[in-house]
């Protein structure tokens, strides 16, 4: 009797563990997340790339690079013309044959104009950076296109006038009895020709800057 009572007490003290019942053939369907629409994500990414702020920022970066190259080219043209001179090895008691840019007012104007253009392009770099940071801002872009147009005209004027003088120095003018001097002053003519070519390159870059600014100011529909 004692053994039976002890066994019944153990049965009462042990917790009863109920196993979950499995419904055979009646399992619940698993819930899956809907598949991601990759086409929609790619379309959204393309729209962000083709947004006005996106392509205008790219134009502003290209503008900054061209502006930096144009500034270096204009200052190089002014420095080359200002440092070009040549003195012939023979001279007389009263004459010394020397060629310098200060002998011709056109060459002096060339140095002044290209120095101004190079300084302007250097000072305009912060405005170009503003256009990169704020590609939709209109006032800095409008300021740049106006100033670039003026500087392009000045550069073309100085380069064209100096090119005419360099042409006369190389070929002369028989109707005006102007003799070519580049046979005697070869180094001087070579230096001035290089400066004129650099100035025309700077003018071409300024023209591209004007086109870029006009393209950036274009309104998108």
Swiss-Prot record:
It is found in: Cell membrane. Its main location: membrane. The chain crosses the membrane at residues 59-79, 110-130, 149-169, 195-215. The keyword Transmembrane applies. Residues 1-27 are annotated as: Disordered. GO terms for biological process: cell wall modification; cell-cell junction assembly; positive regulation of amyloid-beta formation; proteolysis; regulation of protein stability. Keywords: Cell membrane, Cell wall biogenesis/degradation, Glycoprotein, Membrane, Transmembrane, Transmembrane helix. Residues 1-58, 131-148, 216-221 are cytoplasmic. GO terms for cellular component: Casparian strip; plasma membrane. Glycans are attached at residue 173. It is a multi-pass membrane protein. Regulates membrane-cell wall junctions and localized cell wall deposition. Required for establishment of the Casparian strip membrane domain (CSD) and the subsequent formation of Casparian strips, a cell wall modification of the root endodermis that determines an apoplastic barrier between the intraorganismal apoplasm and the extraorganismal apoplasm and prevents lateral diffusion. Belongs to the Casparian strip membrane proteins (CASP) family. This is Casparian strip membrane protein 3. It comes from Arabidopsis thaliana.
């Amino acid at each position: 009797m004692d053994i039976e009572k002890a066994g019944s007490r153990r049965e009462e003290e042990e917790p009863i563990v109920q196993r979950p019942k499995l419904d055979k053939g009646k399992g619940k369907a698993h819930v899956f997340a809907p598949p991601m629409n990759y086409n929609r994500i790619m379309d959204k990414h393309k729209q962000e790339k083709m947004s006005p702020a996106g392509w205008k920022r790219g134009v502003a970066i290209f503008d900054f690079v061209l502006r930096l190259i144009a500034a270096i080219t204009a200052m190089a043209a002014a420095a080359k013309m200002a440092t070009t001179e040549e003195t012939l090895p023979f001279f007389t008691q009263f004459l010394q044959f020397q060629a310098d840019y200060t002998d011709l007012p056109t060459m002096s104007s060339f140095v002044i104009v290209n120095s101004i253009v190079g300084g302007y392009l250097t000072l305009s770099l912060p405005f170009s950076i503003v256009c990169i940071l704020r590609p939709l801002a209109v006032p800095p872009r409008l300021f740049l296109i106006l100033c670039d147009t003026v500087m392009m005209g000045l550069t073309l004027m100085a380069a064209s006038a100096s090119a005419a003088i360099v042409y006369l120095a190389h070929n002369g003018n028989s109707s005006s009895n102007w003799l070519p001097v580049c046979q005697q002053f070869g180094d001087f003519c070579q230096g001035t020709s290089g400066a004129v070519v650099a100035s025309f390159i700077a003018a071409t870059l300024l023209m591209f800057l004007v086109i870029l600014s006009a393209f950036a100011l274009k309104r998108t529909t």
